[in-house]
């Protein structure tokens, strides 16, 4: 399916029934990274798995920023008349979900943030250096966005009042201090640092991801 917004065509897959959960992938990926997770969620949830602008089957554009992607998500939620969906974002998708919850809190019901960072300085130093080198050889809007955005402050996190699950690997390219800052500044946040996992290993292993998020999702259902 396609949603049209800002002169762009945004692809999304919709399946299942029940409370709505929106899945947001990371940089350079598309919605299929969640393929097996979608199968687990669909019997219990209405799943909306989105391809971000300039990714997957969505329109190509050089207008790439976390702000633009956040506006895309807000438009999608409003346009599809989704009522305070759960937002599950990985990496760039987690940044977008977090920015939406900060800027338009009425649009989100809960957050699952996997591998998010607040600023480029939140990446481990070796990761920043590697990205700069890669950008020098192969400059792209995607790489430029990662090197200069986002710019989220701890004070902004205080605006997030919805239930939030924060995930990161113990070997993540996001600095541990950054993940702790996110979790400690969101008032209803639950934190899990996953031993032995890197930035995306537990995401690619959708079965593991499902086991990680099930208790959190079940808790939301008990409080509805």
Language-model-detected regions and their locations in the chain:
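Active-site loop/oxyanion-hole signature of alpha/beta-hydrolase fold enzymes
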Residues: 39, 49-86
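Conserved alpha/beta-hydrolase "acid-adjacent" motif
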Residues: 173-178
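Conserved HGGG/HGGXW glycine-rich cap/lid loop of the alpha/beta-hydrolase fold
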Residues: 8-57
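Catalytic histidine-centered segment of alpha/beta-hydrolase-like enzymes
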Residues: 197-206
């Amino acid at each position: 399916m396609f949603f049209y917004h800002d002169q762009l065509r945004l692809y999304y897959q919709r399946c299942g029934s029940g409370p709505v959960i929106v899945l947001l992938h990371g940089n350079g990926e598309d919605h299929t990274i969640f393929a097996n997770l979608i199968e687990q969620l669909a019997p219990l949830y209405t799943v909306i798995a989105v391809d971000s602008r300039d990714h997957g089957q969505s329109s190509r554009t050089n207008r790439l920023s976390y702000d633009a992607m956040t506006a895309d998500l807000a438009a999608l939620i409003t346009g599809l008349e989704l009522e305070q969906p759960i937002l599950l974002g990985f990496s760039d998708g987690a940044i977008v979900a977090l920015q939406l919850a900060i800027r338009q809190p009425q649009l989100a019901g809960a957050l699952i943030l996997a591998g998010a960072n607040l600023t480029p300085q939140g990446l481990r130093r070796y990761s920043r250096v590697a990205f700069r080198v890669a950008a020098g050889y192969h400059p792209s809007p995607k790489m430029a966005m990662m090197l200069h955005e986002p710019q989220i402050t701890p004070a902004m996190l205080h605006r997030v009042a919805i239930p939030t699950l924060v995930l990161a690997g113990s070997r993540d390219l996001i600095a541990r201090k950054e993940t702790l800052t996110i979790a400690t500044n969101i008032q209803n946040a639950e934190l899990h640092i996953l031993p032995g996992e890197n930035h995306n290993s537990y995401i690619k292993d959708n079965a593991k991801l499902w086991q990680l998020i099930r208790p959190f999702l079940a808790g939301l259902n008990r409080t509805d």
